[in-house]
Amino acid sequence: QDMFRLSGIHRDVYLVASPKVRLRDIHLTSQISDRLDKAELKVKTDVHNYGKKVQEATVRVSLLNTEGKPVSSFIIPTGKITGGQENVCEGTTTIRDPRLWSAETPSLYTVQLELLDAAGNVLEATSQQYGFRKIEIRNNKVYINNALILFKGANRHDIHPQFGKAVPVESMIEDILLFKRFNLNTIRTSHYPNDPKMYSLYDYYGLYVMDE
């Protein structure tokens, strides 16, 4: 393949300290109505009990709009979690007239999750930005939010002329702004996944991604 192969640790490596009961994984999906006037957000969480005793908790989910104002909040009970096991917990909420994400209007909501113990104390908190979008294929053509999309893009290698594969965030942003100035709306991550931080930047600045 047309790339340089470099050895060593070139992306973030870190340890995570967590409570014995924690949010091990979070999965967000949504359904947009045909008229684009309603969005249903589905939150799926894997809550793991790393301790030995049976535990029970709740997950509090808050949805904030693009200005950071709360538009919805709901509770997901975890049920009793046996020591060393995890429960898969799901919940949904619906909002009216969502601001939809596209490459031209990259509107991002914030989904906040808090894991609460039986006494209501916060054990863990995390957040994830999320863009509501409706993606369809009709007659071999791609529609996003009911609009026909022409993908204009380029390949991108995750590499820097000075730092190799340890690409600084400033260089990532510089690449994205260059793509936008050239009126591109799509990036193909040839031939491997980009640094995880890149996907947050793609969402923030508004670029479609063909991920390899």
Predicted regions and their residues:
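Secreted/periplasmic carbohydrate-active enzymes, especially glycoside hydrolases
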Residues: Q1-P196, L201-V209
